[in-house]
């Protein structure tokens, strides 16, 4: 009987390189929200991948970028604080983007960490094979990576090979979570993220970064349905109007799409009620950020 391996693996990189898509593909379920808009992930989100021989807990971190407000500061600290708490690190970049200052900043942070770091070049389906080697060499010039894996998270190219390498590299250890558990976050957190994803999909560019979702209540199932009540938080009355839409149509569409994903995730019929609340400048209000679950003082 082979030894069982287990451990924690951080996924780090600039905003919008495909970290959440990668983790969702591996798990076969949507637990981290995806959007073409940058800075979608705000918290560290743990996804649990289990096989008979291993259990890998992937930590999907917020994209690292120059902070513009207290929320951005929280997101950067959340990502960087993960590095010393895991067994291995996946540094994800895009195959169709040249190495930039943001990548250099991340690699300087990685230089302080005594963990194996794997360079993951995502979206290889968007470039010609001959274009990959110069990109790989440019990254290897600046950092001694444990291994390099060109992958396509959407097409699942080379993902199995990466999982095998990670399994072999992780220490011998127990299975931390039941085999059917996909995340250690509570249901209300994942539900809030799925609602926020639909807002990102449907609203204009001026709204997404100013939006938060607070799930107030998930009641026991009544009449065969799970009752969920949530507030969508925005900073301005104009943003509230955009999210509600003419005759309430935008809010209705957000609810319809979110309910569909929530039902798929939880396996239950859902009655979802949404309201929109204006909280001016909430992204720079530490007390309000804490009430939403963001607390930079907890990050060291």
Curated annotation (Swiss-Prot):
One of its GO terms (biological process) is ribosomal small subunit assembly. Residues 203-280 form the KH type-2 domain. Signal peptide: none annotated. It is a peripheral membrane protein. Residues 39-43 are annotated as: G2. GTP binds at residues 13-20, 60-64, 122-125. GO terms for cellular component: cytosol; plasma membrane. Keywords: Cell membrane, Cytoplasm, GTP-binding, Membrane, Nucleotide-binding, Ribosome biogenesis, RNA-binding, rRNA-binding. Residues 151-153 are annotated as: G5. Residues 60-63 are annotated as: G3. Its main location: cytoplasm. Residues 13-20 are annotated as: G1. Residues 122-125 are annotated as: G4. GO terms for molecular function: GTP binding; GTPase activity; ribosomal small subunit binding; small ribosomal subunit rRNA binding. It comes from the Bacteria. Residues 5-172 form the Era-type G domain. Pfam families: KH_2, MMR_HSR1. An essential GTPase that binds both GDP and GTP, with rapid nucleotide exchange. Plays a role in 16S rRNA processing and 30S ribosomal subunit biogenesis and possibly also in cell cycle regulation and energy metabolism. Monomer. Belongs to the TRAFAC class TrmE-Era-EngA-EngB-Septin-like GTPase superfamily. Era GTPase family. This is GTPase Era.
């Amino acid at each position: 009987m082979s030894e069982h391996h287990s451990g924690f693996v951080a996924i780090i990189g600039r905003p919008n390189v495909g970290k959440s898509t990668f983790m969702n593909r591996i798990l076969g379920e949507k637990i981290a929200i995806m959007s073409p808009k940058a800075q979608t992930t705000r918290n560290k989100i743990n996804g649990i991948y289990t096989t008979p021989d291993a259990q890998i807990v992937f930590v999907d971190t917020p994209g690292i970028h120059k902070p513009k407000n207290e929320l951005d500061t929280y997101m950067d600290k959340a990502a960087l604080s993960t590095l010393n708490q895991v067994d291995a690190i996946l540094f994800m970049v895009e195959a169709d983007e040249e190495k930039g200052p943001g990548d250099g900043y991340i690699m300087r942070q990685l230089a302080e960490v005594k963990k194996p770091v794997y360079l993951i070049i995502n979206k290889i389906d968007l470039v010609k094979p001959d274009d990959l080697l110069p990109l790989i060499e440019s990254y290897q010039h600046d950092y001694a990576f444990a291994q390099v894996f060109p992958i396509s998270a959407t097409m699942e190219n080379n993902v199995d090979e990466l999982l095998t390498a990670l399994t072999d590299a992780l220490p011998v250890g127990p299975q931390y979570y039941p085999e059917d558990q996909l995340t250690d976050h509570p249901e209300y957190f994942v539900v809030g993220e799925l609602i926020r994803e639909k807002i990102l999909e449907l609203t204009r560019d001026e709204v997404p970064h100013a939006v938060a979702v607070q799930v107030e209540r998930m009641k026991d199932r009544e009449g065969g349905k799970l009752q969920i009540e949530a507030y969508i938080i925005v900073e301005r009355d104009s943003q509230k109007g955009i999210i509600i839409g003419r005759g309430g149509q935008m809010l209705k569409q957000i609810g319809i799409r979110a309910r569909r994903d929530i039902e798929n995730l939880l396996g239950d019929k859902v009655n979802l009620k949404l309201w929109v609340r204006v909280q001016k400048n909430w992204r720079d209000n530490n007390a309000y950020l804490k009430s939403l679950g963001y607390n930079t003082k907890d990050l060291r």
